[in-house]
Curated annotation (Swiss-Prot):
It is an enzyme of class 2 (transferase). Homodimer. S-adenosyl-L-methionine binds at G112, I132, G133, D134, Y135, V136, L137. The keyword Methyltransferase applies. It comes from the Bacteria. One of its GO terms (biological process) is tRNA N1-guanine methylation. It holds the Pfam family tRNA_m1G_MT. This is tRNA (guanine-N(1)-)-methyltransferase. HAMAP family: TrmD. InterPro entries: Alpha/beta_knot_MTases (IPR029028), tRNA_m1G_MeTrfase_C_sf (IPR023148), tRNA_m1G_MeTrfase_TrmD (IPR002649), tRNA_m1G_MTases_N (IPR029026), tRNA_MeTrfase_TRMD/TRM10 (IPR016009). GO terms for cellular component: cytosol. Gene3D superfamilies: 3.40.1280.10, tRNA(m1g37)methyltransferase, domain 2. PANTHER family: TRNA (GUANINE-N(1)-)-METHYLTRANSFERASE.
């Protein structure tokens, strides 16, 4: 998989992709992450990527020309499954979407900034608009990092223990069951006896019951689908 991220602040996320699971995925050749500075696609001496909006609205708007140049340059080199724009008013990102996008070959993620992008880009070049939550961030860079992490980590081979990834919260619209490690007792706080029993079937049953209970209590909306 290849993910191309277009941003006005590459330094904001470069470090994120050089550690932990994201670095491991790239080292294994299972994912490529390329970060593109939008200012490299400007043609004026000030390298401007924003301008005042028509209509006298507040804020600044990302200019159409550098975005179009960058996207078209990338698309001339290879085909892309999706051209994604990070925006608070997009479709809500969730595990189901991450699973689907992980099957893609190539993705472009355009990070929103300022008041937004010239809407013509959204009309003519963007294929999917995604939000990671009902709140506003300084820019779409953090959203792009969140999405890339959720997508890449479930590519087969990225995580050595694939069963661990499959049992994470939200994979079955359920929250994960509680987990424990040694010592079995600490200051009177005990690990549930069932987990020490070695009885695999009963442990699986306990895990499902705990997942259901936690989901009903903390995220009942997940059980409504």
């Amino acid at each position: 998989m290849r993910i191309d991220i277009i941003t006005v602040l590459p330094e904001m996320i470069e470090g994120f992709f050089n550690c932990s699971i994201m670095k491991r995925a790239q080292d294994k050749g299972l994912a490529e992450i390329h970060i593109h500075n939008l200012r490299d696609y400007t043609e004026d001496k000030y390298r401007r990527v924003d301008d005042y909006p028509f209509g006298g609205f507040a804020g600044m708007v990302m200019k159409i020309e550098p975005i179009e140049r960058c996207i078209n340059t990338l698309k001339a080199e290879r085909d892309y499954d999706e051209v994604i724009f990070t925006t608070p008013d997009g479709e809500q990102f969730d595990q189901k979407m991450a699973n689907s996008l992980s099957l893609s070959g190539n993705l472009i993620i355009l990070c929103g900034h300022f008041k937004g992008i010239d809407y013509r880009i959204r009309e003519h070049l963007i294929t999917k608009e995604i939000s990671i939550g009902d709140y506003v961030l300084t820019g779409g860079e953090l959203a792009a990092a969140v999405m890339a992490d959720a997508i890449v980590r479930i590519i087969p081979g990225v995580i050595s223990d694939e069963q661990s990834a499959l049992s994470d919260s939200f994979q079955d619209n359920l929250l994960a069951a509680p987990v424990y490690t040694r010592p079995a007792e600490y200051k009177g706080w005990k690990v549930p006896e069932i987990l020490l029993s070695g009885h695999e079937a009963k442990i699986k049953e306990w895990e499902l019951q705990q997942s259901l209970e936690r989901t009903r209590r903390l995220r009942p909306d997940l059980l409504e689908d």
